[in-house]
Curated annotation (Swiss-Prot):
Involved in the biosynthesis of isoprenoids. Catalyzes the 1,3-allylic rearrangement of the homoallylic substrate isopentenyl (IPP) to its allylic isomer, dimethylallyl diphosphate (DMAPP). This is Isopentenyl-diphosphate delta-isomerase. One of its GO terms (molecular function) is isopentenyl-diphosphate delta-isomerase activity. Its EC number is 5.3.3.2. Pfam families: FMN_dh. One of its GO terms (biological process) is isoprenoid biosynthetic process.
């Protein structure tokens, strides 16, 4: 029940409080060079891409947010239905609750709303140090018919929660066991503080093929925990990390330095399809957003669909104005960083 209460707190705080990182994602330092003569018909712009052996109509992921409560069930169902209509991917929030409270399954079950989407199950990697087994990880995947399992890394969040899990020792070998055991790929994801080149390499070396950088610039989970603090000391500790983390753009570059061959998701502080286009150009395969979708999904499926359409149109216009007919063309679009051309 404590886990369910925490999830309720997280939704309410994210919807009503300012929990943004004090750091920028870094994408404002990157600008596309405008192409005044693209020689393309806008109606022929192709935003499709392939991810986890499925075709996405746009390289967009509704990043993991919630689950485990009635409100979360409604949010997830609206997100999934909108993702199905748009042909984009979706991640579920942490499913640890399901292992202790089986009755929460319906808060994560969205396949009836979204039979065709790329769907990602999710649990905190540190739970492998607290008794969660590879077999249970497979159960999470099977229970929602997911295409992959996210193991999220939230060390700073855990350390700033009074009830947080603080033993992160010898975790990498356990993650490797899950990678080798599962019938689907494992995605390693930070939660808003970024992955370094060194950390990325550690996961690549044990067989992980997909990384979500989830850098700084968007939601800061230490700030969320500051609002949950039950005394002033806990609040002051959590609040002091507002400027912590690797900005998303920097993390994206670091992960790409670690490997050109893995799949990379860019998330963390992306505000628009323009930021998403920049992320694709800088090495991401797809890009994820959470905050804009959460607020919409708390109201209606139609608002989620409108938000998705906004991001897709921003992406398409960016592609048109850079002369990029396809996502592969966009990856080579002319770009300037801090007023210096990038090639």
């Amino acid at each position: 029940m404590l886990d369910i209460k925490r999830k309720q707190d997280h939704i309410e705080i994210n919807l009503t409080k300012n929990v943004e990182s004090g750091l920028s994602s870094g994408f404002e330092s990157v600008q596309f060079v405008h192409n005044a003569l693209p020689e393309i018909n806008y109606s022929s712009i192709d935003t499709t891409t392939t991810f986890l052996n499925k075709i996405l109509q746009a390289p967009i992921l509704i990043s993991s947010m919630t689950g485990g409560t009635p409100r979360a069930r409604d949010i997830n169902c609206r997100l999934a239905a909108a993702a199905q209509k748009a042909g984009i991917a979706m991640g579920l929030g942490s499913m640890r609750t399901l292992l202790t409270e089986p009755s929460t399954l319906d808060t994560f079950t969205v396949r009836n709303n979204a039979p065709d989407i790329v769907l990602l199950a999710n649990i905190g990697a540190v739970q492998l140090n607290y008794g969660v087994t590879p077999k249970q990880c497979q159960y999470l995947v099977d229970s929602v018919k997911a295409d992959a399992l996210i193991l999220h890394l939230n060390v700073l969040q855990e350390l700033t929660q009074p009830e947080g899990d603080k033993n992160w020792e010898n975790l990498l070998p356990k993650i490797k066991e899950v990678v080798n055991y599962l019938s689907v790929p494992v995605i390693i994801k930070e939660v808003g503080f970024g992955l370094s080149k060194k950390t990325a390499k550690q996961f690549i070396d044990i067989g992980v093929k997909i990384l979500d950088v989830a850098g700084s610039g968007g939601t800061s989970w230490s700030q969320v925990e500051a609002y949950r603090a039950t005394n002033s000391l806990q609040n002051r500790i959590a609040s002091s990390f507002i400027n912590w983390g690797i900005p998303t753009l920097d993390s994206l570059k670091m992960v790409r330095e670690a490997s050109k061959d893995i799949s990379v998701i860019a998330s963390g502080g992306l505000k628009s399809g323009i930021d998403g286009a920049k992320a694709i150009r800088m090495g991401a395969d797809i890009f994820g957003l959470a905050g804009p979708f959460l607020k919409a999904a708390d109201v209606s499926e139609n608002l989620v669909s409108e938000e998705i359409q906004l991001i897709i149109e921003q992406l398409k216009i960016t592609m048109m104005c850079t002369g990029s007919h396809t996502i592969n063309n966009l990856k080579k679009a002319e770009l300037r960083m801090n007023h210096i051309p990038l090639y």
